[in-house]
């Protein structure tokens, strides 16, 4: 036996033990995604820092806080693509960890100030804007949602609060509302405060809210948002049709003891129905599943398409409609709101879509 040969076996065993204790990485790469995802995601969604969105991880399983500029990233910890970031893994790009970097792009000029591509700024307390390759996109920091009339608040109105940036909705007697103007008119006027759009030489700051939740938990409903993405740069309300899931067989799945099924795709082609009209084309939409543990599943990533409907007497009409890409199950379930969950009336102002 060679000198020192008796120590080689323990060293080899130690190296083997270290490799066994690190199964999550192979040659600098993360282990493949687990299939199925069930059981590995936290029950509650992550609490991200202000301005940091929650996105699905690289496996499409769990919500994680998007990594910001200069932070480490990986397929399971993606960068904030909405902020113009990408995961720079170096020249080899082996699929392992990297650093979130800003995509190259043009700078933006607003109110005499130059902002770099991907840079976020606040022109006022009401708006947060981002420079994206020479274009400025802004989102309101205040809640621009409508407070619809209901039994408890038949005449809502938005007012300014001293010492606070954002307006608040209040409920006042009918006489005071009639003296002060209609609630919708007050809302439309105040929604453009803080940005002077009268100067045609100034940039029109894009302001678009997120789509509201679908008005029905099953069957055809509608959702709304407020935007000024038009030539007049005026705040208008947009509405689209939506269907989270069909109403028939609305039972939580107990397949192999699973508590939730986030997203499921229709096995057969279906036609959407809107009042007495039927979609011309057939679709295989994705629906949000149900849970039997008290959580609810809602759309996480969606897109809007134009659906053509065939109506009685040979008439045709087109309506924007939400299609679901992915859903997420969580405990922050929407509360019942009788003023919001109303039948979709095609003659009402809410149904002008």
Curated annotation (Swiss-Prot):
Residues 1-26 form the signal peptide. It is found in: Secreted; Cytoplasm; Cell junction, Gap junction. Keywords: Cell junction, Cytoplasm, Disulfide bond, Gap junction, Glycoprotein, Growth factor, Proto-oncogene, Secreted, Signal. Residues 29-103 form the IGFBP N-terminal domain. GO terms for cellular component: cytosol; extracellular matrix; extracellular space; gap junction; intracellular membrane-bounded organelle. Residues 203-248 form the TSP type-1 domain. Disulfide bonds join 33-59, 37-61, 41-62, 48-65, 73-87, 79-100, 260-297, 277-311, 288-327, 291-329, 296-333. Residues 106-172 form the VWFC domain. Immediate-early protein likely to play a role in cell growth regulation. Glycans are attached at residue 276. PANTHER family: CCN FAMILY MEMBER 3 (PTHR11348:SF8), CONNECTIVE TISSUE GROWTH FACTOR-RELATED (PTHR11348). The gene is CCN3. GO terms for molecular function: growth factor activity; heparin binding; hormone activity; integrin binding; Notch binding. This is CCN family member 3. GO terms for biological process: angiogenesis; bone regeneration; cell adhesion mediated by integrin; chondrocyte differentiation; endothelial cell chemotaxis; endothelial cell-cell adhesion; fibroblast migration; hematopoietic stem cell homeostasis. Belongs to the CCN family. Pfam families: Cys_knot, IGFBP, TSP1_CCN, VWC. Residues 260-334 form the CTCK domain.
């Amino acid at each position: 036996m060679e000198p020192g040969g008796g120590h080689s076996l323990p060293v080899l065993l130690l190296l083997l033990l270290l490799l066994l204790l690190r199964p999550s990485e192979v040659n600098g790469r993360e282990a493949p995604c687990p299939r199925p995802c069930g059981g590995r995601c936290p029950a509650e969604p992550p609490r991200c820092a202000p301005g940091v969105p929650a996105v699905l991880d690289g496996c499409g399983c769990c919500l994680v806080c998007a990594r910001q500029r200069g932070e480490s990233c990986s397929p399971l910890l993606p960068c904030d693509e909405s902020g113009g970031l990408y995961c720079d893994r170096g020249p080899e790009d082996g699929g392992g960890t990297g650093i979130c970097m800003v995509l190259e792009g043009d700078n933006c000029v607003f109110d005499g100030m130059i902002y770099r591509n991907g840079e976020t700024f606040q022109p006022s307390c009401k708006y947060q804007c981002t420079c994206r390759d020479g274009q400025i996109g802004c989102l309101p920091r205040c809640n621009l949602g409508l407070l619809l009339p209901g039994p408890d608040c038949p005449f809502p109105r938005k007012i300014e609060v001293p010492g606070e940036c954002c307006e608040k909705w209040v409920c006042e007697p009918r006489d005071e509302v009639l003296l002060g103007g209609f609630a919708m008119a007050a809302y439309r006027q105040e929604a453009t405060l803080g940005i002077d759009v009268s100067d045609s030489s100034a940039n029109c700051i894009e302001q678009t809210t997120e789509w509201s939740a679908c008005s029905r938990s099953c069957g055809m409903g509608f959702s709304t948002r407020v935007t000024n993405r038009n030539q007049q740069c005026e705040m208008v309300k947009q509405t689209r049709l939506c269907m989270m899931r069909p109403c028939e067989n609305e039972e939580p799945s107990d397949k192999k003891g699973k508590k939730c099924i986030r997203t499921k795709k229709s096995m057969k082609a279906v036609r959407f129905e809107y009042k007495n009209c039927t979609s011309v084309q057939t679709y295989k939409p994705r629906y949000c599943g149900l849970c039997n543990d008290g959580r609810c599943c809602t759309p996480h990533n969606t897109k809007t398409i134009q659906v053509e409907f065939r109506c009685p007497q040979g008439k045709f009409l087109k309506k924007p409609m939400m299609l679901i890409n992915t859903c997420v199950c969580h405990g922050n379930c929407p509360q019942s709101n009788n003023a919001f969950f109303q039948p979709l009336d095609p003659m009402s102002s809410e149904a002008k879509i």
